[in-house]
UniProtKB/Swiss-Prot annotation:
It catalyses: L-cysteinyl-[protein] + hexadecanoyl-CoA = S-hexadecanoyl-L-cysteinyl-[protein] + CoA. This is Palmitoyltransferase ZDHHC13. Residues 313-320, 369-370, 492-518 are lumenal. Belongs to the DHHC palmitoyltransferase family. AKR/ZDHHC17 subfamily. PROSITE patterns: ANK_REP_REGION, ANK_REPEAT, DHHC. SMART domains: ANK (SM00248). Keywords: Acetylation, Acyltransferase, ANK repeat, Cytoplasmic vesicle, Golgi apparatus, Lipoprotein, Membrane, Palmitate, Repeat, Transferase, Transmembrane, Transmembrane helix. It is a multi-pass membrane protein. It comes from the Eukaryota. GO terms for molecular function: magnesium ion transmembrane transporter activity; palmitoyltransferase activity; protein-cysteine S-palmitoyltransferase activity.
Length: 622
């Protein structure tokens, strides 16, 4: 922020709420309107030869400042408001002037202003990450406190400058450092900043969850409850904050919530307390380990029950309809007791596997006598075995999760910050790692995935660099299995049902096959549903891979970008599209009798542009 008007705001600053942001160099992405208006209202200095050194510093007029200092001005001398030149240079992000003043003897930790702050404090308030880096490199002490008792990390938390928080912690400043009242950054975040951040961001650095402050002896969870900060309460409970610690008044977080009559927080605390109590029972722990198996068994039984009701020996469809409604009502209750919320995302996967189970049983029991000895039978067996294999490989193979140790994360943060690249385009604020090219953070898996394609509902896993090729074969053999069952259904009806399609038409034919075997029609409908989506996805994937060289995420992102562009954006003209044969060779990592050779790229660790020898193209992130 520039200008003298903004500096006066900083001198008399009170710690109110600030909009969060993670812009370039740590500058808040959504700038305060008053500060923006103040910047626009600043007068232009046409003649800088007569301005004083304070104004020259504020406006970054280096030559005028150098002239006055060399004429004898003491760079340590504060102005009438007790603000040094280094303060003015720091708040206005004048890097060259800071270097010059320090070289002329300026005290890097000189206190000044109404809040008795250091230049580092002023730079942090405005979110100037390059200035923070420069001051620390010249010996600024981040542990010093201002007149309100806040150190550097506390100010960064209050003003929600996540890049500065990450940089300070990576430079060995304690995430549990206390202010004058004994409050840690996590306490301040939970109490002063309403919302999920920076509480969630701080939790990634493993702060102490159960430490208490000096005066009230509140934990971070106490402070979040006191402020009614629902998002912070959720984050702290997920991290494992204690529910039993009492403050100086003998109150637990639940007691405080009851006093404040915040019904949502009361519900959250009681639910968490109940879950932690259940964890003590061996049966409950066993059920949690078997949640996915129980979900699969529930799906298998439910699908059998639906088919059994449809095949029930009764002409009353009203009775069958009532039984189906009752069945769905009962099955909707079971997951609430047997399966946790996080594992409900695997419901489509359980539905798919249950469908395949009953498809196989139907083929073996009903269709096998009509197709025994035929090549179609062996083709079906091969297809279903291959489907199960590639489903397992898609599910079990690492899709390309990016991993880094705590020390590597801190080194990456420091490196990115000091090169001016600590922003959301190159740094993942969830994983605290440098993002490889073509990667994306999956919020379901809570990890960055290399060459991210999608999070597949049907496999319950991300599709990325490591398992994308398995996913293609999974779709192919699923289409094959469903195609064979559709074929087998018509063979079964032609052999076992008296149909008059040619004489009476389609409607009569449908009534005849429903009356003949509702179960087979039910299985046919399941097979048709899975055949439809799997074939569509397979064709879409092959088109993207062979003709575009893009992932699903990249294609969707480019289509969204094209809506806001004046010129038409061609999906074929991207650096990743190297031609039909080369795209396939690179994707499946196989050549074609020496005519096409694949280019081996490890997308889990590819951070820079890649030179492709096949077409002499440079690959860039879409």
């Amino acid at each position: 922020m520039e200008g003298p008007g903004l500096g006066s705001q900083c001198r008399n600053h009170s710690h109110g709420p600030h909009p969060p942001g993670f812009g370039r160099y740590g500058i808040c992405a959504h700038e305060n309107k008053e500060l923006a208006n103040a910047r626009e209202a600043l007068p232009l200095i046409e003649d800088s030869s007569n301005c004083d050194i304070v104004k020259a510093t504020q406006y970054g007029i280096f030559e005028r400042c150098k002239e006055l200092v060399e004429a004898g001005y003491d760079v340590r001398q504060p102005d009438k408001e007790n603000v040094s030149l280094l303060h003015w240079a720091a708040i206005n992000n004048r890097l060259d002037l800071v270097k010059f003043y320090i070289s002329k003897g300026a005290v890097v930790d000189q206190l000044g202003g109404d809040l008795n702050s250091t230049p580092l404090h002023w730079a942090i308030r405005q979110g100037h990450l390059p200035m923070v880096i420069l001051l620390l490199q010249h010996g600024a002490d981040p542990t010093l406190t201002d007149g309100e008792g806040f150190s550097s990390i506390h100010l960064a938390v209050l003003f929600q400058h996540m890049p500065i928080i990450a940089y300070l912690i990576s430079k060995r400043q304690s995430v549990n450092m206390t202010d004058v009242n004994g409050q840690t950054p996590l306490m301040l975040s939970a109490h002063k900043v309403i919302g999920p951040e920076p509480t969630g961001f701080l939790l990634k650095f493993n702060p102490s969850l159960n430490v208490v402050d000096k005066i009230h002896q509140n934990t971070p969870l106490h402070w979040a409850v006191a402020a009614g900060n629902v998002n912070a309460v959720d984050k702290l409970l997920e991290a494992g904050s204690s529910l039993d610690i009492q403050n100086v008044k003998g109150e637990t977080p639940l007691d405080m919530a009851l006093q404040n009559k915040n019904q949502l927080i009361i519900h959250m605390l009681k639910t968490e307390a109940k879950m932690r109590t259940n964890q003590k029972f061996r049966l409950w722990r066993w059920l949690q380990k078997c949640e996915l198996f129980l979900l699969l068994m529930l799906s298998v039984i439910t699908m059998w029950a639906v088919g059994y009701i449809l095949d029930f020996n009764s002409d009353s469809w009203l009775l069958k309809g009532c039984l189906l409604v009752t069945l769905f009502f009962l099955t909707s209750l079971f997951p609430r007791f047997l399966v946790g919320y996080k594992n409900l995302i695997y419901l489509p996967t359980a539905f798919l596997l249950s469908s395949i189970f009953w498809i196989f049983m139907t083929w073996f029991i009903l269709f096998f006598p009509d197709l025994a000895g035929a090549p179609f039978y062996f083709s079906f067996i091969f297809s279903i075995v291959a489907f199960l294999y590639f489903f397992y490989k898609t599910w079990a193979t690492d899709p390309g999760f990016t991993k880094a140790s705590e020390e590597e994360k801190k080194v990456n943060i420091i490196t990115l910050a000091e090169t001016g690249c600590l922003d959301f385009r190159t740094f993942c604020t969830s994983c605290l790692i440098r993002k490889p090219l073509r990667s994306l953070h999956c919020h379901v898996c809570n990890s960055c995935v290399a060459r991210y394609d999608q999070h597949c509902l049907w496999t319950g896993r991300c599709i990325g660099f490591g398992n994308h090729h398995y996913y293609i074969f999974f779709l192919f053999f699923l289409s094959m299995v469903c195609g064979w069952i559709i074929y087998g259904s018509f063979i079964y009806w032609s052999n076992h049902c008296a149909t008059t399609f040619k004489e009476d038409g389609l409607w009569t034919y449908l009534n005849q096959i429903v009356a003949c075997s509702p179960w087979v029609l039910y299985i046919l409908m399941l097979a048709t549903f899975h055949f439809s989506w799997s074939t569509f996805l397979l064709l879409n994937q092959l088109f993207q891979i062979a003709f575009l060289g893009l992932t699903s995420h990249e294609r969707i992102s480019l289509l969204k970008q094209s809506k806001h562009m004046k010129q038409t954006l061609s999906l074929r003209k991207t650096p990743y599209n190297l031609g039909f044969m080369q795209n396939l060779a690179d994707f499946f990592q196989c050549g074609c009798f020496g005519l096409v050779k694949p280019c081996v790229v490890d997308w889990t660790s590819q951070y820079t542009m890649v030179f492709h020898p096949a077409r002499e193209k440079v690959l860039r992130s879409v």
